[in-house]
Amino acid sequence: SRKREGMTILPPFNTSEAGINTGRADALYGSISYISNSNKEYVLFTDCNVVCSMNYDKFIKAHIAKDADITIAYANGIPSKIENGTELIMDADGRVTGTGLVDCYSSSVNYSLKSMIIRRTLLERLLHEAHSAKIDDFETIVSKNIKHLRIYGYEQTGFVRVLDSLQSYYDVSLELLKLENRKQIFTAD
């Protein structure tokens, strides 16, 4: 049924052990029992501050076609002044070979949109690894495993903006008043 097979949104779950969540890995670990009991093969997670029109069917098909362990959505360009932004360093095939920190002085780079697809069982393993090492940021645990995992990038093209402040929210809202930008976000299909 739709209720059992559709998308599930996991809110951060605070436990008495963990207290307040300090990062994505910490928040996901709070829901580890739900994740472990799921029958889904893949998990997609994404931040809520990216404005774009992403085709998740194409995203998952690219993940499967590459036989990837993790696929990370990225955009190429000059990133906004995002804090803790991650640059993806990739080979010619799109495999992530390293990461770097995006700063406000960055030129055109492949920057992570913090959306990724991962096999559920691998997610569980990485969350346990992060929890035992007291790593609360999921991107840190992924970066530590770049040499051991098949991590690929998936380029998001078109209108892509990252909201990182009230000012950027206002600026992007103004950009969406332009018909050509709205057409890239709100498609007929």
Where are these regions (language model features)?
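Conserved core of the sugar-phosphate nucleotidyltransferase
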Residues: 53-124, 129
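Conserved N-terminal catalytic core of the sugar/cofactor nucleotidyltransferase
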Residues: 1-51, 58
